[in-house]
Curated annotation (Swiss-Prot):
Domain J, residue spans: 2-74
The keyword 4Fe-4S is annotated on this UniProt entry: no
Alphabetically ordered keywords of this record: Chaperone
InterPro entries linked: DnaJ_domain, HscB, HscB_C_sf, HscB_oligo_C, J_dom_sf
PANTHER family recorded: IRON-SULFUR CLUSTER CO-CHAPERONE PROTEIN HSCB
GO cellular component terms given for this protein: iron-sulfur cluster transfer complex
Record flagged with keyword Transport: no
UniProt similarity note: Belongs to the HscB family.
Function: Co-chaperone involved in the maturation of iron-sulfur cluster-containing proteins. Seems to help targeting proteins to be folded toward HscA.
Subunit note: Interacts with HscA and stimulates its ATPase activity. Interacts with IscU.
Name of the protein this chain belongs to: Co-chaperone protein HscB
Name of the gene: hscB
Length: 172
């Protein structure tokens, strides 16, 4: 059973976050290992496995990028284990330029303001790419959606690096 079915959703990108959380709590209550303390060992093990699957499914479906990766995996695009790399040279050059820009920010006199501006720019890029990915997933354009997810992974890492720099600057 796939994660969408487990939570009673159709296998598509759009998931109601509130409903997901409510169904997660219901499933947790239903399969919590404490409810199976007096059950035979086989039943306890099955409950533990089911609880683990429920937790994994929830973590996957609640995170937009993980949800997209999972949906693609259901359609034959295993992005997490693939050896394919991005072939979009312009995007890769843009990423290298952005990373260089981020490295230089730390040493600027106006690092706080520059970092805020940089962070806003990256957030806008993520927003645009996410909208494109959602449209591709809705249209079942799986190869294009997979490419967008690969690009969003780069941007996600860049956002994480930006947050780490912000924490370092605040700690100074």
């Amino acid at each position: 059973m796939d994660y969408f079915t487990l939570f009673g959703f159709p296998a598509r990108y759009d998931v109601d976050g509130s409903l997901l959380a409510a169904r997660f709590q219901d499933l947790q209550r239903q399969f919590h290992p404490d409810r199976f303390v007096t059950a035979p060992e086989r039943d306890r093990l099955l409950a533990m496995q089911q609880a683990t699957t429920i937790n994994d499914a929830y973590q996957t479906l609640k995170h937009p990028l993980k949800r997209a990766e999972y949906l693609l995996s259901l359609h034959g695009f295993d992005i997490n284990n693939e050896q394919q790399t991005l072939r979009d040279t312009a995007f890769l050059i843009e990423q290298m330029t952005l990373r260089e820009e981020l490295e230089v920010l730390e040493h600027r006199a106006d690092a706080d303001e520059a970092l805020m501006s940089f962070s806003d720019k990256v957030a806008k890029m993520v927003q645009v790419r996410s909208a494109q990915m959602i449209n591709e997933l809705d249209c079942q354009a799986w190869p294009q959606a997979a490419d967008s997810v690969r690009k969003l992974r780069f941007l996600d890492r860049l956002q994480q690096q930006t947050e780490q720099l912000e924490e370092r600057l605040l700690g100074m």
